[in-house]
Amino acid sequence: MKLNVNLPRKPYDIIIEKGSLSKVGQWVKELWQPQKIALITDNRVGSLYAEKVKLGLEDAGFEIVVFDFLEGEASKNLTTVNKAYEFLLKQGMTRSDGIIALGGGVVGDLAGFVASTYMRGIHFLQIPTSLTAQVDSSIGGKTGVNTPLAKNMVGTFTQPDGVLIDPDTLNTLGKRELIEGMGEVIKYGLIADVELWEILKDLDGSTDSILENAEKIIYHSCNVKRQIVVEDELDNGVRLYLNFGHTIGHAIEATAGYGKVMHGEAVAIGMVQISRIAETKGLMLQGITEKIEAMCLKFGLPTDYSPWNVEPMYQALKHDKKTRGQMIKMVVVPQLGQAAINQISLEEMKEYLEK
């Protein structure tokens, strides 16, 4: 399966194919001339796939160096970025060379940020290995790292030269890591793809049902993301729809401590909680929140977070990129397959969270 992200400045393809990791050398050679490549990964994914990818690229004529870091959201910071810069400099990486991100969302976000800022930008490719990264973070060009106060607060818009998705990599994920990716998948069905929502309704919620339908799930999700990014690359309009569940979700991630609550889990909680607020305000059809919660619970995703720690969450919301003055943009789903943007005051949001 192939999807094209047809951006005027930099179009690129998303390849979705089981077993495609075995063809990585051929894929990269079609995009880049033989050169030096830094493979950026984390210690867990690196132990599984780095050698296979390295050998495939070397067989295609590339010189490969590998930079890895400790897995997890806690590593997605400027300290790790600086270590990557030092590594690239010591390896003699130049602007004609490239970086490949091999891993989940943390790896992709961090490697993309490094690629976009090292020497003011070098070539970059994404090979996402987690469900969250395959359906969401590897597409669209957002890169970034966290600060102690807020998630993805430092970042760039930098499109990759291509995205290679091998659904077989999902087989090596732990149960929790696979399930958390369904938070983003459910989001896509809710904001723009009723057909995807119906596919999810037919699944029994087991990990086997996710893996058996992975290509279909990934394709639908990537297609929604692709269409939205092409319409609004720089996040000034409809791309905000992709933040459904993320406002409260990011606040939970920041206040719980990065990595304690996984991203897709936080998104699931955020979707349910923001929908409860929206239904109370008459911004959504009655009963949609119940459907969202039931879908999340079916796949084993959390829908509530305790303790709420409302004051730290309130402080995190104040730093959210959607906050303007004392108001914050709130993405809601008026009906299934449709998203809308409303505003709510930070104080009103705090009052709802305290209930």
Curated annotation (Swiss-Prot):
Molecular-function GO terms, alphabetical: 3-dehydroquinate synthase activity; metal ion binding; nucleotide binding
Classification via InterPro entries: Dehydroquinate_synthase, DHQ_synth_AroB, DHQ_synth_fam, DHQS/DOIS_N, DHQS_C
Its GO biological process annotations read: amino acid biosynthetic process; aromatic amino acid family biosynthetic process; chorismate biosynthetic process
List ligand-binding residues for NAD(+). 71-76, 105-109, 129-130, 142, 151, 169-172
Question: What are the binding positions for Zn(2+) in this chain?
Answer: 184, 246, 263
**Enzyme class label:** lyase
Q: What cofactor is needed?
A: NAD(+); Co(2+); Zn(2+)
Q: Which catalysed reactions does the entry list for this protein? A: 7-phospho-2-dehydro-3-deoxy-D-arabino-heptonate = 3-dehydroquinate + phosphate
Q: Which residues cross the membrane?
A: none
Q: Which NCBIfam families match?
A: aroB
**So what does this one do?**
Catalyzes the conversion of 3-deoxy-D-arabino-heptulosonate 7-phosphate (DAHP) to dehydroquinate (DHQ).
Q: What is this protein called?
A: 3-dehydroquinate synthase
Lineage, highest ranks first:
Bacteria, Bacillati, Bacillota, Bacilli, Lactobacillales
Q: Which gene encodes it?
A: aroB
